[in-house]
A protein has these predicted regions:
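Sec-dependent N-terminal signal peptides
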Residues: 4-13
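A sequence-level/structural motif corresponding to short, flexible coil/turn segments enriched
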Residues: 16-435
Length: 435
């Protein structure tokens, strides 16, 4: 969830404490590995997938012609999951889309990073300062690429998360020079401000969200000692980071959860009030909410944390097994329920609930109530490796997850049987109302 979606009290729908039903599944790609990194919707219920594609790819009857090695792709689906168009850009090297959001007019904004030095955008070469540079791009409702803005230096710089405020300004986060950052642009791509920490703070921004008053929340990781404006940041090891900013980019508070080895939020969400949920992973152990979560081996365990409006931890939950466990996407319905997605590659336990693997990597989708109680869990996938990266909620009763799959893969009553080695997908789930 990248922004607060406002809707009136009379549209509120209470959801039953049982798993949702899968409404549809869309998949597409080419002969190699393709995946969706981010998903969002517009006011009409159309679905936008920010993805990476290796080689030529087909999305229903829509074709993407590869520009080189890996291209960033933006695919628009209608509310029934049928592809309307595919757009994007790329060059001879690796170029990825990592975040997507829409405005009230149906324009889509994408952030990510590109390595290619031969990317052409509207007849002009996109400048690259070295290795990977971060980009922000605007696409019209018909898929036309309107503009691209670039940030970065000689090292590897990344764009990861994007959100939009009530004025139509977009904000992005990622990493430049090994530090997290936040940049705000207006709708025409003019930079309004850019912020990053001072001192010896390293880390990366991964998720970004807005509350109902246009406050900005960054999620990711940080280590070292320094400050973000007047807000001190200090952690001896890599810590899961949530940082609240004013609409002008000034720091208000920070919450850090250090891992004995490392910890990071892959995505965050907030509601209109400014309550925050983070989904990520850690190695070693973390102390949070009066508990110690310990990994059973050297692989990652999943972490889910809920903060109040002051940045204080309210509850935390653990995805814990002998294999690799990831909590990757999180969203909220603005009424205290949070939804989390991710994947695991061996039998695992989510907040006390056992999950059994069907293959080498399985998808989970789960709901938590306002106090952190596990309401339901839904699994998806097949006998091979399947992943769920992003999740978004569309009022009153829709959840959409996305990622990569290998066939055959099952999502509720739907089965995907045709794909290449790994295709991107999106799956819409309908929440059940309380009877």
């Amino acid at each position: 969830m990248k922004r607060y979606l406002a809707f009136f009290v009379f549209t509120i729908q209470l959801h039953a404490a049982e798993p949702p039903a899968c409404d549809w599944v869309f998949s597409g790609g080419g002969a190699s590995h393709d995946k969706t990194r981010a998903v969002t919707t517009d006011g009409a219920g159309n679905v936008f997938l920010a993805s990476e594609c290796v080689g030529d790819a087909m999305f229903g009857d829509q074709q993407h012609k590869s520009a080189g090695e890996m291209d960033m792709c933006l695919t628009k689906l209608d509310a029934a999951g049928m592809p309307l168009w595919v757009s994007g850009f790329g060059g001879s090297k690796t170029d990825r889309a990592y975040g997507v959001i829409t405005d009230a007019a149906g324009n889509a904004y994408v952030t990510g990073h590109f390595e290619s030095t031969d990317v052409m955008v509207n007849g002009e070469k996109l400048p690259n300062a070295g290795n990977f540079d971060a980009f922000t791009a605007k696409f019209a409702p018909d898929g036309k690429l309107l503009w691209v803005r670039v940030k970065g230096g000689e090292g590897s710089d990344y764009g990861h998360g994007i959100a939009i405020d009530s004025k139509g300004h977009v904000v992005i986060t990622g990493a430049i020079g090994g530090q997290f950052f936040c940049t705000k642009y207006d709708a025409e791509g003019r930079e309004i401000w850019h912020r990053s920490p001072s001192g010896k703070v390293s880390g990366s921004g991964h998720g970004i969200a807005m509350d109902g008053k246009d406050h900005i929340y960054l999620g990711g990781s940080a280590s070292g000692a320094g400050a973000f404006g007047k807000i001190a940041i200090e952690s001896k090891t890599s810590a899961a980071l949530v940082l609240k900013l004013t609409p002008e980019g000034e720091g208000e508070w920070v919450n850090l959860i250090p891992g004995t080895t490392s910890a990071i939020y892959h995505e965050i969400a907030c509601d209109s009030q400014g309550r925050v949920w983070g989904a990520g992973m850690f190695k070693g152990s973390v102390n949070v909410a009066g508990q110690t979560f310990q990994c059973s081996g050297k692989d990652y365990d999943g972490l889910i944390v809920h903060l109040d409006v002051e940045g204080q931890v309210q509850w935390a939950r653990h995805l814990h097994g002998p294999g690799t466990d990831y909590c990757l996407g999180v969203t909220t319905d603005d009424h205290g329920t949070s939804f989390v997605c991710g994947d695991f590659n061996q039998d695992t336990v989510l907040a006390g609930h056992a999950l059994t693997t069907r293959g080498s990597g399985d998808i989970f989708l789960a709901a938590f109530d306002v106090k952190g109680g596990l309401t339901w869990v839904q699994q998806a996938g097949g006998k091979q490796n399947d992943n769920a990266y992003p999740i978004t909620f569309r009022a009153p009763d829709e959840l959409i997850i996305a990622g990569a799959l290998s066939t055959p893969a099952t999502f509720g009553s739907h089965e995907v049987t045709i794909s290449a080695s790994s295709d991107l997908y999106a799956a819409k789930w309908k929440l059940k109302a309380v009877k």
